[in-house]
């Protein structure tokens, strides 16, 4: 045995040297890829040592698992069937990748997978009958004959179905290219025996054969000009080696193609007929005859088994040979030898064609190569012959010829089964692939190809392929993950889906699609250089136009940002997209299960309750809260949000900015005062459009940073409360409060209201009139001076002058004091409440320097908060603090003591700064003052307004006199409008009686249940049909002829309950808008407006009919049943057992039930229609006058009463347009900033209700100046 091993090793080395010389020659010519490798390998269990003989028990390629491409047998088979299609492709994209020159056998799946689905693959054609000649061979290994075997399989590659479509004549057949496949599989049987079967085998591409394999595959020549493409693959488990070779078609020269055409055959036959008269010219050979003759010529030497058998030669004069082909090609093209002999009897020379001797092809490698070429020729002739036979007509006489029968007898098949047999696949796999219908179109999907996966692979096999490819090719892991994800979803495989979910990987396709969603070309950018700021900026821009972004596009953008956040490992991007506010505000409120009208405290409570009940909805609740905070622009809600979700502070905290960045964001410099910074911040916060959801968080972070750097108490308090703390402001930056001097805080509201009206305030502050001035004026004018339609007495004038001076002193103190609040004089309160017909006694002495208030020198400052029991006027809202403290006045002792150091009393102790007043001091006793305050508590606020304005008018000189000698002055100019009332007899419409009246305010009635302020105005100005003794039936119309500068609207809320004999207050909400338009109520001749009014009236009548019908259908009878309920109860009764036992016929009962059900359905249908029609009509009515905006008014003041008719508390909201449109709440000495939502709070059950609204005409908003402070 040792001698045999030495001889074997010597034989191998000799053969190796021959191969080296051959390779050197090939390399010089073509650059061979086959290189020499060390003679060692690795055992499955142990490492072998260099120089060992191949004993068949060692791995020759221990590191093959690190090679790419990695393919399975299914993938290799599909590559074989598609390779020539790529090589012949003219697709520019295929050519751009060079696949038309290289083929795909050695290429990565990623390079060609996208083209595969559009390719119709070839078929694998093989000879089934191995008796005729063998296309399958088995050889012992030269390097390890004991254990290793080489299996060789030859077949053809073409698409018979496509070929049949392309041929219409016999001449077309030779144009069909039939390619040839040779597959050599070296099996290491000992390693296969020890193999652990763990699923689908993975084969890795091999560039360099091991020496032991080169010996066994020495017929392989990469430089062979007939070789189109090849690939060498080795399994990672047993090193099973597959050598795939694809060859060009045989008989591929033009002259060979032409020789099989009908013309060439006929010409050749006719030529032989001339030489041989025995031939019949009408019996021209068919193409099948030619193919079959040539097939027999090449088959002959393949069937010779031993040298003992005689060699079958061909006579050169053979008629079939000479008529079916050019006999010279046997020697010039096909390797035959011509042998000539002389006949001794005739001296004629006989020539024979001797085929190559192929008996020793097993041992002689050159002979083996020749044999394989003959096999290829035979196979091509067989399949050409069968194509040619298929063109014969069914009744063709050629069907019975020897050639056709011979070709038909050759058993061929188009099946992939031989491939799997060759590779030794498992029986189950072979059975699976034995049925061609089991092949799935999924196998042509790019994602399946990229993972070298077939549709029937188990989840484990797919995962193994993914892991191997990802490990070998990490740069393309994204593409492999795309493939895995697609396969998992396509197959619906739970294990795969779960596995994908555990992978922290971004698919390449998903990544590129995400970038394309962001309009970034992945081919033109370096993805690793994209930062979160850029991506977030693009996302904000793409989602900014809500009207153009569809829900699907938005979803895709969000998913793209999530994916990019994961890819860039950006926690901020992930947080941003997860917490992005809802697009629809209603969704946020629905998430928290609250109504949009609730206040912020309820929102916070609802949020806390929701997350406590459903912790899993924490993220949804965070988004909802975030959405509402943005909608309300509520700093308080943002504070609550960051407390409940600290992640917001992590990404939008002040530490993310430096001081200069914070200043830059607010567009201020470092020298700006805190007040200026807050002013600009509030402009940005409340006035700027919402372009980016997180802009409020960024602004808040910037302001917080500034507050920290400056250690600013003012900014810190603002950040905590959302309002400016007046105590932190310099006095000149905040209005002055007014102390309550006796539960008359509606007087304080009224005084603040008048102070905010700049023209009136300036007039009062500049007032210098005396009684003598008026006497002189009246003497010179010659007019009878009337106010409110009556003459004014001297006493009233003198009293009014004193009132204006008291008011002037208060206003002066409010402008110039350094304190937070001032206390009005009791004389001012007395004169404001005491009716104008009550005479006031003054001291005789006048024209002297007096204090600012003009009070008696012995008067004392009082601050009473006593509660009074009064007789209540049945139409008034009373300002009364209850003893139990409920609904009480805010001006309590505690509050007053708290602000005592900030109070400034307008009294004789104040430095007057030289104000002179040619007035006399009113002599008012304590009892008179108490009585006046008592009257004030019983008065409606409008009575006080009338009293105050009457005194201002009485103490003012007229600008002019109207026709009725009514004084026209600043009060009339600011507050009064006129209406025209027309009485039109229906029987004589030309006899119209009109009356023009002045109005100070419009009274709207909440008792009519108006749905909004326009609905209330409609009731006020609606036409009324009356019956008058003088005219009979008439229509009364009211319209505004002159609109005031300041429009005052009184809301009637107190009514008298005649059953309970007591007043009550209606707290029904009356929604009002910040801007209203009064065009529809104007006295006009505009035909368009008149037509709209008429149309609207008709629509309202129609609406009234529909609502009456709706009420009728929903009304309940004495038993509490609606009409529908009654029908249902009747049905229930008729279907009961009681009725069934009565003599009543079943048919009649069924008819009644059917009728009742129809009635129920009809009611439901009618109610649904009424509901829709009413909503539609109300919506249309609400927009009837949208185009009429000549008389526009802007809201600036809202008087509030909280409590019931018999007690409660007053305050006022005033808007400051000069300070970013903020609303302030004036609650006696306390003035605070409030959010707009507090002013426009129309919640049901809210006892703090508006009762007096004040609007200013658009264009004159500058006349409203709530803040006026001048400090020295």
UniProtKB/Swiss-Prot annotation:
GO molecular function, one term: K63-linked deubiquitinase activity
Biased composition (Acidic residues): 902-911
Superkingdom of this protein's organism: Eukaryota
Record text on subunit structure and interactions: Forms a ternary complex with RSP5 and RUP1. Interacts with RSP5. Interacts with FZO1.
Purpose: Has an ATP-independent isopeptidase activity, cleaving at the C-terminus of the ubiquitin moiety in natural or engineered linear fusion proteins, irrespective of their size or the presence of an N-terminal extension to ubiquitin. Hydrolyzes polyubiquitinated 'Lys-63' polyubiquitin chains in RPO21, producing mono-ubiquitinated RNA polymerase II. Removes ubiquitin chains that initiate proteolysis of FZO1 and inhibit mitochondrial fusion.
Enzyme class (EC, first level): hydrolase
Protein EC: 3.4.19.12
Annotated active site: 745 (nucleophile), 1209 (proton acceptor)
PTM annotation (Phosphoserine): residues: 907
InterPro entries reported for this sequence: Papain-like_cys_pep_sf, Peptidase_C19_UCH, UBP14-like, UCH_repeat_domain, USP_CS, USP_dom
Homology family: Belongs to the peptidase C19 family.
Deleted gene: phenotype: Increases the amount of polyubiquitinated RNA polymerase II subunit RPO21.
UniProt protein name: Ubiquitin carboxyl-terminal hydrolase 2
Positions of the UniProt region annotated as Disordered: 884-918
Keywords: Hydrolase, Phosphoprotein, Protease, Thiol protease, Ubl conjugation pathway
One Gene Ontology term from the biological process aspect of the record: ubiquitin-dependent protein catabolic process via the multivesicular body sorting pathway
Catalysis performed (reactions): Thiol-dependent hydrolysis of ester, thioester, amide, peptide and isopeptide bonds formed by the C-terminal Gly of ubiquitin (a 76-residue protein attached to proteins as an intracellular targeting signal)
Species this chain originates from: Saccharomyces cerevisiae (strain ATCC 204508 / S288c)
GO cellular component: cytoplasm; cytosol; nucleus
Domain USP: 736-1258
Misc: Present with 2420 molecules/cell in log phase SD medium.
């Amino acid at each position: 045995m040792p001698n045999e091993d030495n001889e074997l090793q010597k034989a191998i080395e000799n053969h190796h040297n021959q191969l080296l010389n051959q390779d050197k020659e090939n390399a010089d010519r073509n650059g061979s890829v086959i290189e020499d490798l060390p003679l060692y390998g690795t055992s499955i269990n142990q490492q072998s040592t260099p120089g060992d003989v191949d004993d068949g028990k060692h791995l020759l390629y221990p590191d093959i698992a690190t090679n790419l491409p990695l393919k399975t047998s299914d993938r290799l088979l599909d590559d074989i069937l598609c390779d020539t299609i790529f090589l012949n492709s003219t697709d520019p994209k295929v050519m751009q990748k060079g696949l038309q020159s290289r083929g795909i056998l050695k290429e990565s799946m990623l390079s060609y997978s996208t083209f595969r689905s559009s390719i119709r693959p070839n078929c694998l054609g093989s000879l089934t009958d191995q008796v005729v000649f063998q296309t399958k061979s088995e050889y012992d290994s030269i390097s390890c004959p004991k254990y290793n075997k080489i299996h060789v399989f030859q077949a053809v590659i073409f698409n018979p179905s496509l070929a049949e479509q392309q041929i219409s004549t016999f001449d077309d057949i030779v144009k069909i290219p039939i390619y040839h496949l040779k597959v050599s599989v070296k099996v290491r049987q000992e390693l296969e025996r020890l193999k652990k079967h763990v699923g689908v085998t993975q084969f890795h591409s091999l560039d360099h054969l091991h020496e032991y394999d080169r010996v066994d595959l020495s017929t392989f020549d990469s430089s062979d000009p007939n070789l189109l493409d090849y690939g060498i693959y080795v399994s990672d488990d047993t090193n099973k080696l597959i050598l795939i070779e694809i060859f060009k078609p045989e008989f591929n020269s033009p002259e060979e193609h032409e020789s099989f055409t009908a013309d060439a055959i006929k010409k050749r036959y006719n030529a032989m007929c001339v030489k041989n008269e025995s031939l019949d010219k009408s019996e021209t050979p068919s193409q099948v005859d030619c193919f079959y003759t040539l097939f027999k010529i090449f088959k002959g030497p393949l069937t010779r088994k031993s040298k003992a058998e005689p060699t079958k030669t061909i006579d050169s004069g053979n008629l079939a040979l000479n008529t079916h082909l050019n006999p010279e090609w046997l020697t010039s093209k096909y390797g035959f030898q011509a042998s000539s002999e002389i006949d001794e009897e005739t001296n004629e020379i006989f020539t024979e064609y001797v085929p190559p001797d192929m008996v020793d092809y097993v041992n002689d490698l050159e002979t083996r190569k020749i044999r394989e070429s003959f096999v290829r020729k035979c196979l091509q002739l067989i399949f050409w012959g069968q194509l040619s036979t298929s063109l014969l007509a069914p009744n063709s006489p050629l069907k019975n010829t020897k050639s056709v029968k011979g070709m038909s007898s050759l058993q061929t098949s188009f099946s992939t089964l031989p491939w799997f047999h060759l590779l030794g696949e498992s029986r189950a796999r072979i059975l699976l692939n034995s049925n061609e219908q089991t092949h799935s179109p999924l196998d042509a999907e790019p994602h399946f190809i990229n993972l070298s996966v077939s549709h029937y692979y188990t989840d484990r096999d797919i995962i193994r392929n993914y892991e191997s490819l990802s490990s070998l090719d990490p740069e393309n892991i994204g593409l492999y993950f795309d493939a895995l994800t697609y396969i998992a979803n396509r197959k619906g495989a739970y294990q795969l889906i779960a596995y994908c979910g555990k992978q922290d990987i971004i698919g390449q396709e998903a990544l590129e699609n995400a970038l394309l969603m962001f309009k970034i070309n992945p081919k033109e950018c370096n993805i690793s250089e994209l930062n979160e700021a850029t991506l977030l900026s693009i996302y904000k821009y793409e989602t900014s136009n809500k009207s153009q972004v569809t829900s699907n596009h938005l979803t895709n953008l969000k998913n793209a940002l999530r994916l990019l956040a994961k890819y860039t490992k950006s926690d901020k991007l992930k947080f941003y997209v997860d917490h992005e506010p809802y697009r629809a505000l209603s969704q946020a409120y629905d998430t928290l299960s609250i109504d949009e009208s609730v206040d912020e405290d309820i929102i916070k409570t609802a949020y806390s309750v929701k997350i406590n009940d459903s912790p899993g909805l924490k993220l949804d609740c965070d988004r909802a809260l975030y959405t509402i905070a943005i909608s309300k622009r509520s700093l308080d809600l943002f504070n609550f949000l960051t407390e409940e979700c600290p992640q917001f502070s992590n990404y939008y905290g002040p530490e993310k900015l430096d001081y200069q960045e914070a200043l830059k964001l607010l567009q201020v410099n470092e020298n700006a005062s805190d007040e200026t910074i807050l002013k600009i911040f509030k402009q940005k916060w409340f006035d700027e459009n919402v372009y980016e959801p997180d802009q409020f968080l960024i602004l808040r972070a910037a302001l917080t940073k500034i507050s920290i750097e400056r250690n600013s108490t003012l900014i810190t308090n603002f950040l905590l409360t959302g309002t400016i703390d007046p105590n932190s402001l310099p006095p000149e930056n905040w209005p002055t409060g007014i102390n309550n001097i006796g539960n008359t805080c509606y007087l304080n509201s009224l005084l603040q209201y008048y102070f905010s009206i700049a023209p009136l305030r300036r007039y009062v502050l500049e007032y210098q009139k005396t009684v003598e001035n008026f006497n002189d004026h009246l003497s010179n004018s010659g007019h009878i001076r009337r106010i409110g339609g009556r003459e004014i007495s001297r006493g009233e004038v003198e009293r009014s002058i004193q009132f204006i001076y008291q008011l002037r002193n208060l206003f002066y103190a409010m402008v110039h004091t350094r304190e937070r609040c001032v206390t009005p004089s009791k004389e001012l309160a007395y004169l404001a409440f005491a009716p104008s017909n009550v005479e006031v006694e003054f001291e005789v002495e006048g024209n002297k320097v007096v204090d600012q208030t003009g009070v008696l020198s012995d008067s004392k400052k009082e601050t009473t908060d006593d509660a009074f029991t009064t007789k209540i006027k049945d139409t008034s809202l009373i300002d009364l603090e209850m003893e139990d403290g409920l609904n009480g006045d805010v001006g309590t002792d505690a509050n007053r003591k708290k602000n005592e150091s900030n109070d400034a009393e307008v009294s004789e102790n104040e430095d007057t700064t030289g104000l002179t007043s040619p007035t006399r001091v009113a002599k008012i006793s304590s009892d008179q003052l108490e009585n006046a305050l008592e009257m004030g508590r019983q008065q409606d606020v409008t009575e006080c307004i009338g009293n105050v304005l009457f005194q201002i008018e009485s103490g003012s000189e007229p600008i002019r006199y109207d026709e009725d000698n009514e004084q026209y002055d600043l009060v009339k100019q600011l507050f009064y409008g006129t209406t025209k009332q027309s009485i039109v007899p229906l029987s004589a419409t030309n006899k119209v009686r009109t009356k023009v009246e002045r109005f100070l305010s419009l009274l709207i009635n909440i008792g009519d249940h108006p749905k909004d302020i326009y609905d209330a105005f409609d009731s006020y100005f609606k036409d009324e049909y009356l019956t008058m003794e003088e005219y009979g039936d008439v229509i009364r119309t009211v319209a505004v002829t002159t609109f005031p500068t300041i429009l005052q609207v009184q809301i009637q809320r107190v009514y008298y309950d005649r059953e309970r004999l007591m007043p009550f207050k209606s707290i029904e909400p009356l929604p009002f808008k910040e801007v209203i338009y009064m065009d529809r109520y104007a006295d006009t001749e505009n035909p368009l407006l008149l037509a709209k009014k008429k149309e609207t009236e008709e629509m309202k009548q129609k609406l009234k009919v529909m609502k009456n019908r709706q009420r009728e259908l929903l009304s309940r009878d004495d038993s509490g049943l609606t009409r529908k309920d009654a029908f249902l109860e009747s049905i229930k009764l008729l279907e009961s057992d009681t009725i069934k036992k009565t003599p009543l016929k079943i048919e009649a009962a069924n008819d009644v039930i059917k009728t009742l059900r129809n009635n129920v359905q009809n009611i439901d249908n009618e109610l649904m229609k009424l509901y829709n029609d009413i909503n539609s009509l109300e919506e249309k009515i609400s927009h009837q006058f949208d185009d009429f905006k000549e008389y526009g008014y802007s809201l600036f003041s809202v008087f509030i009463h909280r409590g019931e008719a018999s007690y409660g508390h007053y305050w006022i909201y005033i808007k400051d347009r000069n300070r970013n449109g903020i609303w302030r709440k004036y609650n006696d000495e306390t003035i605070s900033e409030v959010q707009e939502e507090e002013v426009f709070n129309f919640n049901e059950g809210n006892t703090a209700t508006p009762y007096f609204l004040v609007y200013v005409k658009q264009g004159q908003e500058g006349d409203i100046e709530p803040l006026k402070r001048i400090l020295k």
